[in-house]
Amino acid sequence: MSDLVSQNLNMIFKTPKGETVHALKDLNFTLKKGELLTVLGPSGCGKTTLLNITAGFIRPTSGSITLNSKEIDGPGVERGMVFQQGALFEWLTVAENVNFGLRMKKKDPFETQKKVDEWLEIVGLKGFGNTPTYQLSGGMQQRVALARSVSYTHLTLPTKA
């Protein structure tokens, strides 16, 4: 089971003027393994706040969010994110970037190299493993970030726009 569950999730911020802003109000959802969720809405509706809570960067005002029945209370290696700006380690190669999360999980080096090669092929970057990431186009960097993110999470196949 790998469900992401939000129950009565609330996030309230105070503005510099002391006004109360409800970024999230009683948000409930269950996302099962293999499902994708798209969050759409106008600026300021809570999309980034939800991602920050899901990543464990901030704690909700009330309610809970759990992954595999464990409350998310901080960043963890069981989740991966791809930011609008890929957040790659520019001094590392493509393969080293993808391998980063796998090394954090202390996987066998032969197994990790095989996984890195598989993910680079899936995202269309086969043969780019030894390329420094700063030499790639923006779109290619996003694909490296996607491969790095999903290589060590529970996801099995990426979706690219």
Predicted feature locations:
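Conserved ABC ATPase "signature" region
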Residues: 99, 110-128
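Single conserved hydrophobic/aromatic residue that forms the stacking wall/gate
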Residues: 157-161
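Helix-to-loop junction immediately C-terminal to a conserved catalytic motif
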Residues: 55
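The feature captures the beta-strand-to-loop junction immediately N-terminal to the Walker
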Residues: 40-42
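Conserved ABC transporter NBD signature motif
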Residues: 63-75
